[in-house]
Amino acid sequence: MGIQTPNGFNLDNSGKRIVVDPVTRIEGHMRVEVNVDADNVIRNAVSTGTMWRGIEVILKNRDPRDAWAFTERICGVCTGTHALTSVRAVENALGITIPENANSIRNLMQLALQVHDHVVHFYHLHALDWVDVVSALSADPRATSTLAQSISNWPLSSPGYFKDLQTRLKKFVESGQLGPFKNGYWGSKAYKLPPEANLMAVAHYLEALDFQKEIVKIHTIFGGKNPHPNWLVGGVPCPINVDGTGAVGAINMERLNLISSIIDRLIEFNEMVYLPDVAAIGSFYKDWLYGGGLSGQSVLAYGDVPEHANDYSAKSLKLPRGAIINGNLSEVFPVDHANPDEIQEFVVHSWYKYPDETKGLHPWDGVTEPNYVLGPNAKGTKTAIEQLDEGGKYSWIKAPRWKGHAMEVGPLARWVVGYAQNKSEFKDPVDKFLRDLNLPTSALFSTLGRTAARALESVWAGRQMRYFQDKLVANIKAGDSSTANVDKWKPESWPKEAKGVGFTEAPRGALAHWIKIKDTKIDNYQCVVPTTWNGSPRDPKGNIGAFEASLMNTPMVNPEQPLEILRTIHSFDPCLACSTHVMSPDGQELAKVKVR
């Protein structure tokens, strides 16, 4: 049956149903169901979160100064970003300011997370949707070396290097123990890279696996550990003693120099390996420009990385803030997190209960009351769902909307907003990337564009880290060693009631926490995370979310090997290591694979 959504998508669920379950995400587990027509083109998409987070319930009546330690545990990969959002929310509620050094250190930690997450995402969670590992066994190492040297001056590019890696890969494959490469769709016609490009990509996969652990040392220096570094309402928990030995976590010159050397290395890797790899791989997929979904229509960015401490105005934020709707890039709307008419969450298709489910609630007034009921046309049981009924409740994810619009968030959304604002630091790299591939601007709104935006942002973030590291050192040398403001640390200094909002741009997109404090305890707490925006189910008007929209009208080579579904869903940066099930219309399993 065909239905046209208010946001412009024609849905038809009459064709064969394919179920991919589970696709594990940072904030929980995810399931995708699609209907394909006789030509194996996706005509209906259903995205569902299959785990209840419930952190809001856990936080009620707790000390707001401790909220960061709980919210940080929502996610173990984008570690720290929920903590930063939480301390900003508490600071906003209580009117707490932070020192300039704390702002620089927070930015360094957040930017290090951006680079680490983007590198890990591309090489270890997404690249194998584009790269055929087994094909690399037939590559010519000399030709691979020529290819690698043609795109960058990265030193690890000799024929001998690739020959040695190919030999190790061959032994790996012949052993039958493929480890991270097990159960891929190797040999699928959906792969387009020549063997040499595949071998180069596998080499860089392994190099990135080794390199990523260096980046997080920045978190251990400033935050004591990784994952889940320490944070502090009012600043950062690391004192500065440039002439000291670094005992008891104090920052001295030795540690500052170590951070500087790590920044140099990550800039080099971004600019000589990561971005060139994305461009090289993209050159073979120029005709696969599916997966745009909402990216060319409605995008949202909160902005982040404040230039100055305590200034969260759009002018101060180095990552852009704004909303674009209906594909009109000539108008970027301001965003106000406190305006109850802007951001609202709906639950008509979510496994929650509202007083009136036809109306949305602003997060300050949000309710997190579970209501797990399947739609009347669902197949299976609550504990063994075979097919969801998208006409009823079908997800643990709420449906946030900005002024009633479903929005995409993430690196692509950020760069589309920056591009629309004609900011050269965003527009020029995008134009160059597309020009080098001989692609039009419209190609940005695709799965490939989403992947490219993440690489471009990683390069940008590395350079910003150099800027804030130099700024921190200069400020310390000028005699300022303050890292925390504890003037309002004691609850006796707080008002009887207060409310605030904290926001960041997590690697995966716009993230905000809303808090209400009453009698020094948390009275209400709501998180709206990037996956809530992108993975949202339908709303009362029938608008579909970003995941669902991105899959629409995508052709599949083989529905029993849903590589195209994973390629697009992964471009939003899900983390996964789980089973995939492909079902026929009557619920019989056609194939079972491990998603990598």
From Swiss-Prot:
Instruction: Reply yes or no: does the keyword Transmembrane helix apply.
Output: no
Enzyme class (EC, first level): oxidoreductase
What organism is this sequence from? Bradyrhizobium diazoefficiens (strain JCM 10833 / BCRC 13528 / IAM 13628 / NBRC 14792 / USDA 110)
Function per UniProt:
This enzyme recycles the H(2) produced by nitrogenase to increase the production of ATP and to protect nitrogenase against inhibition or damage by O(2) under carbon- or phosphate-limited conditions.
Q: What SUPFAM superfamilies does the entry give? A: HydB/Nqo4-like
Please give the PROSITE patterns that the UniProt record associates with this protein: NI_HGENASE_L_1, NI_HGENASE_L_2
The highest taxon in the source lineage is Bacteria
Annotated Ni(2+) binding sites: 75, 78, 575, 578
Per UniProt, what is one GO molecular function of this protein?
nickel cation binding
Q: Which Gene3D superfamilies match?
A: Cytochrome-c3 Hydrogenase, chain B
Where this protein primarily resides, as one coarse class?
membrane
Q: What cellular-component terms does GO give this entry?
A: plasma membrane
Q: Which cofactor does it need?
A: Ni(2+)
* Compartment(s) where it occurs, according to its Swiss-Prot or TrEMBL record: Cell membrane
Q: What is its EC number?
A: 1.12.99.6
Complex and partners: Heterodimer of a large and a small subunit.
Protein's UniProt keywords contain Transmembrane helix: no
Co-factor binding details: Binds 1 nickel ion per subunit.
Q: Catalysed reaction(s)? A: H2 + A = AH2
* Protein name as catalogued: Uptake hydrogenase large subunit
